[in-house]
């Protein structure tokens, strides 16, 4: 019934298996990939024909994690998987980025790649495995995909590169880098690092590329026995139309791309496009020689050619800068004084307002992952409203791009944050992109660094980011610093680097062409370093280090530790005690399983009151110490005094006063405040207190007072 084919290799110390022919046989391509005991099903379906009038390639990558893969049942009311999580969105983008450039140009059939994690061994991360599975499924599907690609994760532990470190090894690694590419070229890099040098980062990319070569060989081996017949698709030759259009609008486009202001430039480009449209689609002609879709494709190609020729021939860019110059930067902090921290970062025509907010442990984000539930105390959210590029558009929940850009900025900032025991706050940073002309994610990095320092978050060092570009024709190439939006769209590489003056904290690279050599990447990294240092210098004009005090409106948090066996006493039956503390003092209290207690309030007196209350519950009274207490009950033989939190003790009638006492109520009454000295404990552990050895007015020991008076005489 099944015509199965399987390839197995040893990869990074674990078996990798690629199997097809048994599951999802109606898809164009389907591969079940296993690494260790983590299993991913990859399927590919591509429409037989493109939709009429479609002028783009509708590729969708959906990565989904099923909770049954880890032996779990989903939380929530409906008990089933819902909308994609942030991680699922990020992994979908991670796979989309290296495969999209490898589809034959001009292919516009609706294509969907679905990756389903069906088993997770809690050791091997399924993201890279899903990338490999997607590559294998595409390679055998028959769609015009110029792969295969491979992918690998690279760690850096004890000064050594590690191929595909498992989940338990990652906390020890100074690097989390995922690289993907073909046998000859790197196509995509995504990473977070702890201030590593350019040499170490480049070495990791090269190490990863070599590491995934066996995977590419395995996919080719599978395709040799299982691939479907390639689809009969030939990209249309539009060179004649391109030559005709170039003759009509070349001068207009060259003039347009000499205009440095974005909106004015777009007006000039639109005028050139209208001129070409009038030439090729004259009024009265019902059947032009080519379609509107072909016209749009060719005009876009011409735009790219004009920009690329100008840069390679003259070294001058769209806005008049040379290759290395960063646009003018203006930084401002304290923009919104009632927020906890804020910054306005403007670089050319790209601008971000970033606001930092500090919260308590109650504000941490609870993340329910396949590997377990954990809390995240640092959140960074990136918003890209349509007005930032002078357009109208959809508003609402964040799209994939916004999630991805926010996570890149998160990776850049995260290594510089203080440890939780040094700064016990939950941090949320929100970046509102108010203008955009390229590199808004790196503006978010710079703005977030400034806003956090303005809020008093003790960053180890300021962080800045820069986006690099590449124009390559044959052997000629130009690396561009701080690229514009047009240079991103029309160029061959988008290379974002963020870090401090000590090293790189995040790197993201997307390459659209083959032939990006190690030498080109080295040039780009070194040029990015110079740009990053320059940007840090410009940021320092606004604020060079974190403020020593928190903002006026930020909550204060103090941390104390209590014995774990006392946690139940502080919480009380059904939370009765801790609720009373919160209600009476006004402070927020968070108690962790290890006995760490975080007390938060904007009022210092409330924090002190809560600390004192908790201390009275968990601390043990010391023999010989004097305490203030309240009489809670009287009896013939003495008085019971509440003197240490919830602790009561007996003052025997003989210890009430120096003179003989006939009746307890002659000396004290219930509710009366008294001073007592802890004399000790009886054989049953009961507390023995004394009032007569303490001056009830001063709270000082009587014997000590008399001795002091004698010494004075």
UniProtKB/Swiss-Prot annotation:
Single GO term (MF): magnesium ion binding
Keyword Cytoplasm: yes
Residue ranges of every copy of the S1 motif domain listed in the record: 624-692
Pfam families on file: KH_1 (PF00013), PNPase (PF03726), RNase_PH (PF01138), RNase_PH_C (PF03725), S1 (PF00575)
Every KH domain range: 555-614
GO biological process assignments: mRNA catabolic process; RNA processing
Gene Ontology CC terms, in alphabetical order: cytosol
InterPro entries linked to this entry: ExoRNase_PH_dom1, ExoRNase_PH_dom2, ExoRNase_PH_dom2_sf, KH_dom, KH_dom_type_1, KH_dom_type_1_sf, NA-bd_OB-fold, PNPase
Signal peptide (from-to): none
The keyword Membrane appears for this protein: no
Catalytic activity entry: RNA(n+1) + phosphate = RNA(n) + a ribonucleoside 5'-diphosphate
Protein EC: 2.7.7.8
Binding of Mg(2+), residues: 488, 494
SMART domains, per database record: KH (SM00322), S1 (SM00316)
Similarity comment: family membership: Belongs to the polyribonucleotide nucleotidyltransferase family.
Listed name of the protein: Polyribonucleotide nucleotidyltransferase
Organism (species): Brucella anthropi (strain ATCC 49188 / DSM 6882 / CCUG 24695 / JCM 21032 / LMG 3331 / NBRC 15819 / NCTC 12168 / Alc 37)
